[in-house]
Curated annotation (Swiss-Prot):
Name of this chain's protein: Uncharacterized gene 52 protein
Family membership: Belongs to the herpesviridae BLRF2 family.
Top-rank taxon: Viruses
Organism field: Saimiriine herpesvirus 2 (strain 11) (SaHV-2)
SUPFAM superfamilies listed in its UniProt record: BLRF2-like
Amino acid sequence: MASRRSCADVEELEKELQKLKIENKALKKKLVQHTSPEDELLTPAQKDAIINSTVNKLTKKAEEKIRERVLKDVLPLVSKNQCMEAIAHIKYRIDVSIDETYNLSRRPASKPRTK
């Protein structure tokens, strides 16, 4: 009795697998039709690399903006208590965009320091 049921389950799973393979093939064809010939499909690793690169660029720009704001708020202060009080109440909203990050990579290389 158990063997009949397991055979039926295996057959059902095989049918489902075939159905999914056909559906997958159709979706791949549809995907290729909607991309231009010059454009390449990304692998998951390539997509991950693009995402990481974008996050790193945005993070770097956000860090620069935060540093500027903290310096502006803390630099005029003279005592440790004033600084700690100011830092405790820091609340910034920072806007960053990819357009800003491209300006970072286009700026000219800085000259080395001379003594």
